[in-house]
């Protein structure tokens, strides 16, 4: 959908909602409206139930604590107010004529009211846990009155979350598993469904995410802070409003609102963060070449300001830095988890595996997070509200991964057991591999929402955009992304193997039998190095509008209809640079002995300090990726660069995709048996349009042609080539984003949710729905 059509749909939808809401007929009976709040905290309560006793007139408060009861009989009526965790309250109201009566209500947990003006008496409690207790009450109350299977939790429910990482919060919710990257929970899986099929929104608007591959649908939460949110909604059974791509559910993150509080509230904290393995004052080595601080400060704050009854705003933010160091041992067991080949790696039974590879790896990184958010709410009238929200977040890591690997490669039958492995003479290898990157992610998201909650018509319309950018930088930051130093032609043996690692590792020269020190960098030859800068962008545009109205057809019935347009644009570029080290003599080697000048000692990382005694492994002398790049820049003749491979990498990893999903839905809510049985059902229709570009490999572009455009043939009857060298051929035949893919399809998604109140504290639920798992964008932009 082009921008004009997109804007037209948004404007027409917004106008339709405004006119529908403005066309309400005057109420013919009395009404009672007001707000319900927690007397202790001043927080307005969402989904508090307000009932006119003895009638079927009932209303639930919205996110601002507001309620409105219509068609209230005249005379003296009693309002019954209920909210989980609070003392139920009954309030008498005298209703006269067809006027609207304002009545605000305050509830308190365990408190007793004698009259409306009496001071609230609070029970004894631990002050530090009050926010968590309020959060638990919110979660239970939301689930109690939800029409579908949903888990709504307050951002305060689990207390302080380290560095504001929302993944640390979400992993505690039932049915949700966080996918970890680099030791951080970053992506959401629900009920076993991969993260690429779990829609994530903020306030109902799609959240942009430039995930690592650049072509996936999974949403990374790096730049989202729990400190900027009011609550989290995990939906396990979709309704017609839910996107059709919710295979097992979706997650909506709700920003703070000024109208959630009756009075201004400021919360803030300042702290120092450190890992127990890295409590060191002053600068010490790691993760890169320059020493860094391992104990870092952080802060976070939130300020909610309801200025008056019509306007309010919120401001929140935070920043944190953590140093993380993680050692890891990796064992490769042949016959149990790794395959044998019957020759160099003899076959064995699962009860008698043998160790063929052992790796010592240490990861270290510095992770910086920062976030800022603000919202502004303005009431256009008694029933209409305009809300603006802006979210901004950054995530920056400087990480390194260093590995020492022992490889047997060949073993004879009878020379292994679960306790030892005797490697074949000269067949083994040890190597040092380093990888590191400088990653910077940024996300910003402005949104605007109009809400109307009138006595007859209720409507909502929204417009928002979310932008995310992710960059991996290495060469321009003064380092190679990867290096490899090798020592081949050695004999590797393992002895005294236990569950963690081999207690004794022996490495000897395959020819002389002399011991080789695998922890000394001078035992290795520098082999290869590479750089992989990557830049990916993702934009998500969202526009929606819906209206609903209540009917009484012998039973309570609500109909809701809406439109929804969501656009996604993903743009990814990557270039993989790979060089081979030859040295001054122009000859590559993997053994730094004799006449070889390829010794890795010339790029020894003297500044990096690995803690001694890491699982009993001696201190290792590592390669410096920074020094290797310095050597490459000062002595380029020592290296070879494959220009053809570099060019092909640039083109093959240049991809862009655009997707527009246009939706309409119709939802009906019906209640029976004195509102004990609730049915929610309907259908959603989604039209998907995709336009993608990727690499095009066209061999005919290298054919000579005559003036008429015909291919020129040689004496052998075959086309005559324009270029014969690999790079020349690649530049002619491999075209940047030359492949074009377009796809469109329409899908219907019916659904129904049923709930039955067996008892006041027991609800039975069932749901049936359909959904679709859209493929990775590489399916369209992968090229041909």
Regions found by a protein language model. Give the residues of each.
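Periplasm-facing N-terminal accessory domains of Gram-negative outer-membrane beta-barrel systems
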Residues: 18-124
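Periplasmic N-terminal accessory/gating domains of Gram-negative outer-membrane beta-barrel systems
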Residues: 87, 97, 102-110, 114-198, ...
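Outer-membrane beta-barrel proteins
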Residues: 159, 222, 238-241, 275-298, ...
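Surface-exposed extracellular loop regions of Gram-negative outer-membrane beta-barrel proteins
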Residues: 206, 569-571, 651-655, 720, ...
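Outer-membrane beta-barrel translocator/receptor signature
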Residues: 213-218, 227-234, 241-253, 258-342, ...
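Transmembrane beta-strands of outer-membrane beta-barrel pores
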Residues: 255, 272-276, 319-323, 392-396, ...
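Transmembrane beta-barrel wall of Gram-negative outer-membrane proteins
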Residues: 290-410, 431, 438-455, 750-753
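Flexible glycine-rich, low-complexity coil/linker segments exposed to the extracellular/periplasmic environment
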Residues: 344-354, 417-428, 488-528, 584-652, ...
């Amino acid at each position: 959908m082009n921008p004009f059509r997109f804007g037209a749909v948004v404007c027409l939808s917004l106008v339709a909602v405004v006119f529908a809401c403005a066309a309400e007929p005057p109420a013919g009976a009395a009404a009672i409206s007001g707000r319900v709040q927690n007397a202790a905290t001043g927080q307005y309560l969402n989904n508090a139930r307000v009932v006119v006793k003895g009638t079927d007139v009932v209303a639930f408060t919205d996110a601002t604590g507001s309620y409105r009861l219509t068609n209230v009989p005249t005379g003296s009526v009693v309002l019954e107010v209920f909210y989980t965790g609070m003392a139920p309250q009954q309030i008498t109201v005298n209703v006269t004529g067809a006027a609207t009566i304002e009545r605000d209500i305050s509830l308190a947990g365990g408190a007793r009211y004698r009259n409306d003006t009496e001071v609230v008496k609070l029970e004894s409690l631990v002050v530090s846990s009050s926010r968590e207790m309020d959060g638990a009450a919110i979660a239970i109350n939301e689930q109690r009155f939800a029409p579908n299977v949903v888990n709504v939790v307050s951002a305060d429910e689990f207390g302080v979350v380290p560095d504001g990482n929302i993944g640390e919060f979400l992993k505690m919710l039932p049915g949700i598993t966080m996918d970890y990257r680099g030791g951080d929970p970053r992506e959401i899986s629900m009920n076993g469904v991969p993260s690429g099929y779990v829609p994530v929104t903020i306030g109902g608007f799609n959240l942009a995410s430039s995930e690592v591959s650049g072509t996936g649908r999974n949403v990374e939460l790096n730049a989202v802070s729990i400190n900027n949110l009011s609550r989290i909604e995990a939906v396990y059974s979709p309704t017609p409003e839910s996107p059709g791509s919710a295979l097992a559910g979706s997650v909506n993150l709700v920003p703070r609102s000024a109208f959630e509080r009756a009075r201004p509230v400021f919360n803030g904290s300042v702290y120092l963060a450190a890992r127990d393995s890295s409590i060191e004052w002053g600068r010490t080595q790691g993760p890169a070449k320059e020493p860094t601080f391992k104990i870092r400060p952080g802060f976070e704050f939130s300020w909610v300001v309801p200025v008056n009854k019509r306007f309010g705003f919120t401001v929140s933010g935070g920043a944190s830095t953590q140093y993380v160091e993680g050692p890891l041992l990796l064992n490769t067991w042949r016959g149990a988890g790794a395959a044998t080949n019957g020759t160099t790696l003899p076959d064995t039974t699962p009860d008698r595996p043998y160790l063929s590879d052992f790796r010592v790896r240490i990861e270290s990184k510095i992770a910086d997070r920062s976030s800022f958010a603000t919202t502004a709410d303005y009431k256009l009238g008694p029933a209409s509200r305009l809300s603006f929200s802006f979210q901004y977040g950054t995530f920056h890591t400087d990480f390194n991964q260093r590995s020492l690997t022992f490889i047997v490669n060949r073993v004879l039958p009878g020379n292994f057991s679960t306790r030892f492995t005797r490697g074949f003479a000269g067949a083994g290898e040890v190597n040092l591999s380093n990888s590191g990157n400088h990653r910077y992610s940024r996300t910003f998201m402005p949104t605007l929402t109009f809400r109307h909650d009138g006595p007859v018509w209720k409507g909502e319309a929204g417009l928002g955009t979310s932008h995310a950018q992710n960059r991996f930088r290495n060469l321009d930051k003064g380092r190679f992304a990867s290096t490899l130093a090798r020592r081949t032609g050695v004999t590797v043996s393992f002895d005294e193997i236990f569950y963690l690692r081999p207690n004794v590792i022996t490495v000897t020269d395959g020819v002389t039998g002399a011991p080789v020190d695998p922890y000394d960098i001078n035992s290795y030859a520098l082999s290869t190095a590479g750089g992989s800068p990557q830049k990916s962008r993702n934009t998500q545009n969202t526009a929606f509008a819906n209206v609903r109205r209540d009917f009484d057809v012998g039973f309570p019935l609500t109909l809701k209809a809406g439109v929804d347009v969501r656009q996604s644009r993903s743009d990814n570029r990557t270039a993989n640079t790979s060089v081979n080290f030859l040295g001054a003599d122009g000859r590559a080697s993997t053994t730094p002995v004799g006449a070889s000048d390829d010794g890795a000692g010339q790029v020894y990382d003297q500044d990096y300090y690995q803690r001694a005694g890491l699982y009993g492994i001696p201190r290792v002398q590592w390669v410096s990726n920074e020094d290797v790049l310095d050597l490459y820049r000062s002595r380029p003749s020592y290296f070879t660069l494959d220009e053809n491979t570099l060019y092909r990498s640039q083109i093959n990893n240049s991809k862009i995709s655009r997707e527009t999903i246009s939706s309409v839905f119709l939802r009906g809510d019906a209640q029976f048996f004195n509102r004990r049985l609730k049915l929610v059902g309907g259908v959603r229709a989604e039209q998907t349009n995709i336009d993608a570009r990727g690499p095009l490999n066209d061999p005919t572009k290298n054919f000579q042609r005559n003036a008429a455009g015909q291919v020129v043939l040689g004496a052998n009857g075959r086309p005559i080539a324009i270029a014969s060298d690999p790079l020349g051929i690649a530049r002619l035949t491999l075209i940047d984003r030359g492949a074009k893919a377009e796809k469109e399809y329409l899908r219907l998604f019916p659904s129904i949710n049923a709930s039955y109140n067996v008892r006041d504290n027991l609800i039975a639920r069932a749901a049936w729905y359909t959904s679709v798992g859209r493929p990775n964008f590489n399916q369209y932009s992968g090229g041909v």
